[in-house]
């Protein structure tokens, strides 16, 4: 799940949304991640003249997400929508999302993915490790009977290592 920041909502509305997500997690325990995305106007849309999300609002919302949401929820922000994606790590994200050296960002095709080597350098300089993962997070992949349909359990096992991350030697 996630929230889009900077479309005219208030800070209190963003906080309330994060609190609702936290409550859902406490009740069901099924939220892998919360994507916090900054609004950027797009040509050809009804909001093309709306100003982009101020960076301060975006960074503050990520920090609030880290404070409000339970620790087991990963916080994600797209690195290609920020001029300085290092800041995203410093305020609380722990996941870059579906960054690909092969495909474009299908949601924001006008914003290319950053170079993976640069993303790795920035990530490591902030004390983190850039590790490939499946679309399912490791803690969910490690508990297949609870979280994954038996129809896809075997492919998940085949594609993940013993920690639940993507195998470096996929079969």
Language model features with spans:
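Auxiliary Fe-S-binding modules of radical SAM enzymes
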Residues: 15-171
């Amino acid at each position: 799940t996630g929230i889009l920041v900077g479309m005219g909502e208030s800070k209190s509305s963003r906080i309330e949304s994060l609190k609702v997500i936290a409550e859902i997690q406490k009740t069901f325990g099924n939220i892998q991640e919360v994507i916090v995305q900054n609004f950027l106007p797009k040509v050809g849309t009804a909001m093309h003249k709306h100003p982009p999300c101020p960076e301060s609002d975006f960074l503050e919302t990520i920090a609030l997400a880290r404070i409000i949401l339970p620790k087991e929820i990963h916080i994600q922000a797209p690195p290609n929508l920020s001029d300085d994606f290092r800041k995203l790590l410093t305020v609380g994200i722990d996941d870059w999302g579906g960054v690909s050296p092969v495909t474009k960002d299908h949601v924001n095709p006008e914003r290319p993915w950053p170079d993976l080597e640069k993303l790795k350098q920035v990530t490591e300089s902030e004390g983190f490790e850039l590790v490939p993962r499946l679309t399912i997070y490791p803690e969910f992949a490690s508990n297949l009977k609870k979280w994954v349909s038996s129809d896809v359990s075997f492919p998940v096992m085949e594609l993940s290592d013993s920690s639940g991350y993507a195998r470096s030697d996929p079969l």
